[in-house]
Amino acid sequence: MSQNESGTIAIPMYDKDDAVLVLEDGQVYVGKPYGALGETTGEIVFATGMTGYQETLTDPSYDRQIVVQTFPHIGDTGVNSEDPESSRIWVAGYIVRDPSPNVSNWRAEGSLDDDLAKNGIVGLSHIDTRKLVRHLRSAGVMRAGIFSGDALTDQATGALKTIEQLLEDVKNTPQMQGLSLYDEVSTKETYTIEPCGEYEGKEPLYTVAAVDLGIKGMTPHRMAERGCRVHVVPSTITFAEIENLNPDGVFFSNGPGDPEQAGPEIELLRQVLDAGYPFFGICFGNQLLGRALGFGTYKLKFGHRGINQPVKDLTTGKVEVTAHNHGFAVDAPIGKQVDAPFENGKYGKVFVSHIDLNDDVVEGLQCVDIPAFSVQYHPEAAAGPHDAAYLFDRFCELMKNNSKEGK
């Protein structure tokens, strides 16, 4: 069910056994409960990956977001203990068209439906997700709520809640723009990933301080595979504490929320740049580098979320298929080197190194005069293609060259 042609709210037919999705603009969809029963609200977004739903659910960048899967059939391979990218599910809610009734995979340890229920994730299924996603592409992402079970009942009267009552709950949800969320998802204590693979048991080639703003588990492992000892540190870390780690380079991770609200992290990053440490940032880290250099950031209409986004490396002309999860982007000029705006070009020249071929959104920044670069997407490939794995090699090369120069 949804708005009628006049734009007013249609009266949906639903009962206590249904699940109801209410959008901020009044659209209503009635389906079946999926996962836990209850109420959840957040920003509704869509993800275009055909696979990798466990990695999606456990990506901290999805904090306070209701995720719609555009691929209709979800849950075939069940869930396992190997694929999660963090210690918990972070999505606020989950929407699929046709959940798989059967689990068929040799690694499966349970069903997705049961896992969502066990973790208290309220979901919804059996709605026209294609129609919903087309609406979000047209109107933009917005606040929404999923209601099922007792959440559909007015406790005072015992009657089903009206759409107006449900819509009021949705409109009381904070807007994503203006939210600071990285502290909410960051580790509270430092932990270390030692070199692995061919470097296991050997002295590290490089030491990296990785600031956790919502880091995915695979990311430090990609650096460890290249001989790095990675200290994953809380977002509350000070520059002095970073210096005490004696790192060869500093990394800023992905994460949720509005980069404009990350003032302390931007100031920390400027201290890192001032000290001459090699810097690599991804996703939220790219946005923070942009703001540290003096560029602005802005909210995208519906963002990039999925594992099939085409990105062009403007330095080589090569096109990469990449994994994305971002609703904000850096506002920087494309096609030329410019002076970084902060403090009259204090950080020298910078240029946009990567763009998204779907919409020309900035997907990477490269500093010319200081050892710093970043990308807006996820090179760790969890889930997703491995086209951008070379970026971790580039970071290692940057640390190697910086060490040779005695910095």
From Swiss-Prot:
PROSITE patterns noted in UniProt: GATASE_TYPE_1
Active site as annotated: 283, 378, 380
EC top class named in words: ligase
Enzyme Commission number: 6.3.5.5
Keyword Nucleotide-binding set for record: yes
Transmembrane spans: none
Gene3D superfamilies: 3.40.50.880, Carbamoyl-phosphate synthase small subunit, N-terminal domain (3.50.30.20)
Pathway: Amino-acid biosynthesis; L-arginine biosynthesis; carbamoyl phosphate from bicarbonate: step 1/1; Pyrimidine metabolism; UMP biosynthesis via de novo pathway; (S)-dihydroorotate from bicarbonate: step 1/3
Pfam families, per database record: CPSase_sm_chain (PF00988), GATase (PF00117)
Catalytic reaction(s) noted: hydrogencarbonate + L-glutamine + 2 ATP + H2O = carbamoyl phosphate + L-glutamate + 2 ADP + phosphate + 2 H(+)
Keyword Secreted attached: no
Disulphides: none
PANTHER family: CARBAMOYL-PHOSPHATE SYNTHASE SMALL CHAIN, MULTIFUNCTIONAL TRYPTOPHAN BIOSYNTHESIS PROTEIN-RELATED
Family statement: Belongs to the CarA family.
Protein name as it appears in the record: Carbamoyl phosphate synthase small chain
Gene name of this polypeptide: carA
